[in-house]
């Protein structure tokens, strides 16, 4: 799945907490045919009403190239005279957005008022012929205005748009028009789930206990890979509600009966990981300093760092650490949840090893006398080369190689975990049989 923009992540929070969130979303196949992309664009509700009532998909075509090789756009199409009203105004507006006359002829020159077929408004243009086309003899323009039109065609100047006068003026830009045509209305989450979502301000939330969640869902040729943090003490949303919202945004069917549906897989994965990490996440450990080897990759960038972490120190949480790292290294904002999630996973793994007695503490050598903690350590030989963060840009081959190695390591860890659990159950069963035989002898 393509990387979700940070704006979409923040909008997810806004749509949960607020009601007035107009949004267009679209989930479609990506170029590699293996993922889905989520396109979104905020819109005005009045603009949506005008778009639904007065437009048709046939009128929303791409801008047409004129005979002189220029693409008409920007302020070339001004507002439509609304005196005719009704469908005529809507048709004229759509024609203006496409650069066409009412009969389909291509307008040339500066738009102006005239006979039917000419785009109204602006500098008066020449009279049109009987076929509705404009000969363009009266329209004059200077190079600076033409340059401004080209710039506006490529990058729309949204601040100069008068939405009150022309609510459909933005549809002349191809990207915005494409969003309207290929997208659908995304309703508010409260309208989707009713009043089942509780307001966190009205719920007594204890200190947060964060659990890292990782999703790997396959459905109908699509593969969803996602990771996020889940607060065990925040009961304002259930895994079922989260799965409903996620499937709604990605245009997946919300079905609970099929076992292989994405809705069922998401709920099952979240519940399994919550049950697995619930005890470890809430476990309080003594003052314990451990060395963390942290890696987080996003797109083609790989972040690698080694540092010492105190498990009993709450003055710095992984989220704050990730914020500082991203600011210091100038990374993109999507690295904040990636680094925080990876650090939470590493800390839970250390807690699990410590609880099972398998933790090998790799303490940094302390050269202070009489057991005192030394101050700043100076590495004269390597100058601390292994203790500073590194960011590498990987090639496509290196990314695929890392993914394959990660899958192999995951399978190996699962096999080792299964062997350990099987050995423990066998030893437990053997002890029970020995106790039973001893009891029978007595």
UniProtKB/Swiss-Prot annotation:
Q: Where is the composition biased (Polar residues)?
A: 134-145
Basic and acidic residues composition bias: which ranges? 415-424, 432-442
Q: Which domain of life does this protein belong to? A: Eukaryota
* Protein name as catalogued: Chromatin structure-remodeling complex subunit SFH1
In which residue ranges is the amino acid composition biased (Acidic residues)?
54-66
For this record, the Gene Ontology CC terms, alphabetical, are:
nuclear chromosome
- Name of encoding gene: SFH1
Asked if the Swiss-Prot or TrEMBL record annotates the protein with the keyword Cell cycle, the reply is yes
Stated family:
Belongs to the SNF5 family.
Higher taxonomy? Eukaryota, Fungi, Dikarya, Ascomycota, Saccharomycotina
Stretch list, region Disordered: 54-84, 102-148, 415-442
Query: Which keywords, in A-to-Z order, does the entry hold?
Result: Cell cycle, Chromatin regulator, Nucleus, Transcription, Transcription regulation
Q: What does this protein do?
A: Part of the chromatin structure-remodeling complex (RSC) which is involved in transcription regulation and nucleosome positioning. RSC is responsible for the transfer of a histone octamer from a nucleosome core particle to naked DNA. The reaction requires ATP and involves an activated RSC-nucleosome intermediate. Remodeling reaction also involves DNA translocation, DNA twist and conformational change.
Q: Which InterPro entries match?
A: Sfh1/SNF5, SNF5
Looking at the UniProt entry, the stretches that span the membrane are none
Q: Name one GO biological process term.
A: chromatin remodeling
Entry's localization field: Nucleus
This protein's record includes keyword Plastid = no
The annotated regions of Gly residues compositional bias extend over 102-115
């Amino acid at each position: 799945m393509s990387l979700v923009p940070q704006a979409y992540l923040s909008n997810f929070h806004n749509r949960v907490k607020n009601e007035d969130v107009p949004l267009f979303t679209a989930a479609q196949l990506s170029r590699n045919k293996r993922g889905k992309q989520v396109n979104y664009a905020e819109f005005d509700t009045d603009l949506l009403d005008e778009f639904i009532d007065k437009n048709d998909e046939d009128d929303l075509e791409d801008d047409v190239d004129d005979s002189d090789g220029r693409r008409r756009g920007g302020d070339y199409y001004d507002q439509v005279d609304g005196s005719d009203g009704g469908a005529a105004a809507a048709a004229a507006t759509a024609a203006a957005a496409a650069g066409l006359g009412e009969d389909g002829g291509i307008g040339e020159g500066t738009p102006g008022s005239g006979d039917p077929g000419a785009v109204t408004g602006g500098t008066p243009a020449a009279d049109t012929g009987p076929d509705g086309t404009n000969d363009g003899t009266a329209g004059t323009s200077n190079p600076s205005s033409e340059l401004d039109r080209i710039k506006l065609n490529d990058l729309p100047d949204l601040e100069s748009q008068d939405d009150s006068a022309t609510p459909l003026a933005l549809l002349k830009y191809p990207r915005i028009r494409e969003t309207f045509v290929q997208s659908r209305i995304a309703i508010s989450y409260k309208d989707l789930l009713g009043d089942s979502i509780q307001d966190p301000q009205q719920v007594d939330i204890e200190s947060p206990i964060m659990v890292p969640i990782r999703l790997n869902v396959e459905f109908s040729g699509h593969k969803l890979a996602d990771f996020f943090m889940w607060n065990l003490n925040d009961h304002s949303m259930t895994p079922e509600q989260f799965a409903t919202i996620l499937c709604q945004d990605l245009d997946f069917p919300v079905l609970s009966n099929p076992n292989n549906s994405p809705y069922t897989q998401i709920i099952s994965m979240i519940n399994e990981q919550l049950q697995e990490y619930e005890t470890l996440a809430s476990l309080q450990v003594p003052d314990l300093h451990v060395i963390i080897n942290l890696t987080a990759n996003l797109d083609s960038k790989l972040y690698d760092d080694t540092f010492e972490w105190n498990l009993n120190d709450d003055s710095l949480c992984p989220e704050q650490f990730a914020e500082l790292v991203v600011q210091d290294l100038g990374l993109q904002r999507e690295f904040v949840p990636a680094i925080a999630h990876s650090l939470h996973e590493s800390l839970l793994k250390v807690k699990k090893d410590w609880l099972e007695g398998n933790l090998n503490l790799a303490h940094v050598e302390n050269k202070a006398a009489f057991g005192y903690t030394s101050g700043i350590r100076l590495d004269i030989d390597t100058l601390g080369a292994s203790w500073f963060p590194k960011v590498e840009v990987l090639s496509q081959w290196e990314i695929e190689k890392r993914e394959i190695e990660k899958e192999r390591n995951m399978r190996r860890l699962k096999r080792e975990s299964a062997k350990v659990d099987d050995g423990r159950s066998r030893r437990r069963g053997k002890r029970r049989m020995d106790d039973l035989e001893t009891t029978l002898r007595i």
